[in-house]
Curated annotation (Swiss-Prot):
InterPro entries: ACP-like_sf, PP-bd_ACP. SUPFAM superfamilies: ACP-like (SSF47336). Keywords: Cytoplasm, Fatty acid biosynthesis, Fatty acid metabolism, Lipid biosynthesis, Lipid metabolism, Phosphopantetheine, Phosphoprotein. This is Acyl carrier protein homolog. Transmembrane segments: none annotated. The modification O-(pantetheine 4'-phosphoryl)serine is found at S45. Pfam families: PP-binding (PF00550). Residues 3-87 form the Carrier domain.
Length: 103
């Protein structure tokens, strides 16, 4: 498990917001944690895959799309806050994200 520092958290949050602002052609100042990816931004699951690909390259993450898919089936990332929280977990747990919350 990787350590998720406050600096990395800020960096990841900025990446998520910048990504959705650019991809959805929305001013970043109009985005907030409650912004719905689908309803407010007309986003889709392919955007999340593209975002994960960016994070994989930036942080050398070892994660399979299947692992992300399994996690998202149980924990949908519907708002920007949930996308940010999911990307934090991806950074920390990589493929083990599917086991997060299990005992």
């Amino acid at each position: 498990m990787r350590e998720l520092t406050s600096e990395i958290k800020k960096e990841i949050r900025d990446i998520v917001y910048d990504f959705f602002s650019e991809e959805c052609e929305v001013d970043i100042n109009e985005l907030n944690d409650n912004t719905s990816v689908v309803d407010d931004l007309d986003g889709d699951s392919l955007m999340l895959i593209e975002l994960v690909d960016i994070l994989k390259k930036k942080y050398s993450l070892n994660i399979q799309l299947q692992s992300i898919g399994k996690y998202l089936l149980k924990n949908p990332a519907e708002t920007l806050e949930k996308v940010v929280q999911t990307t934090y977990l991806l950074y920390e747990y990589e493929n083990d994200i599917t086991n997060v919350g299990e005992k």
